[in-house]
Amino acid sequence: MESMKMKLIVVLMVAIVAFSAVGNVAAQTEAPAPSPTSDAAMFVPALFASVAALASGFLF
């Protein structure tokens, strides 16, 4: 059971690194910045933080 948790944590970390790498590649393209009143820039980090909190609460 303990090794399964460790494998799941490793898989989650790899997925987070992969998603952040994809986000950095997408950020290098020319695109207009969101307006200051838009919450679009905060959506992705908030999503990752929520998923990480739920996963750690579920595992531990």
Curated annotation (Swiss-Prot):
It is a lipid-anchor; GPI-anchor. Expressed in reproductive tissues. Expressed in chalaza, funiculus, stigma, septum, style and transmitting tract. InterPro entries: AGP3/12/13/14/21 (IPR039281). A lipid is attached at S38 (GPI-anchor amidated serine). Disulfide bonds: none annotated. Keywords: Cell membrane, Glycoprotein, GPI-anchor, Hydroxylation, Lipoprotein, Membrane, Proteoglycan, Pyrrolidone carboxylic acid, Signal. Residues 39-60 form a propeptide. Contains 4-hydroxyproline; hydroxylated on Pro-32, Pro-34 and Pro-36. O-glycosylated on hydroxyprolines; noncontiguous hydroxylproline residues are glycosylated with arabinogalactan. The keyword tRNA processing does not apply. Its main location: membrane. It comes from the Eukaryota. The modification Pyrrolidone carboxylic acid is found at Q28. Glycans are attached at P32, P34, P36. It is found in: Cell membrane. Residues 1-27 form the signal peptide. GO terms for cellular component: plasma membrane; side of membrane. The modification 4-hydroxyproline is found at P32, P34, P36. PANTHER family: ARABINOGALACTAN PEPTIDE 1, ARABINOGALACTAN PROTEIN 12. Proteoglycan that seems to be implicated in diverse developmental roles such as differentiation, cell-cell recognition, embryogenesis and programmed cell death. Belongs to the AG-peptide AGP family. This is Arabinogalactan protein 12. It comes from Arabidopsis thaliana.
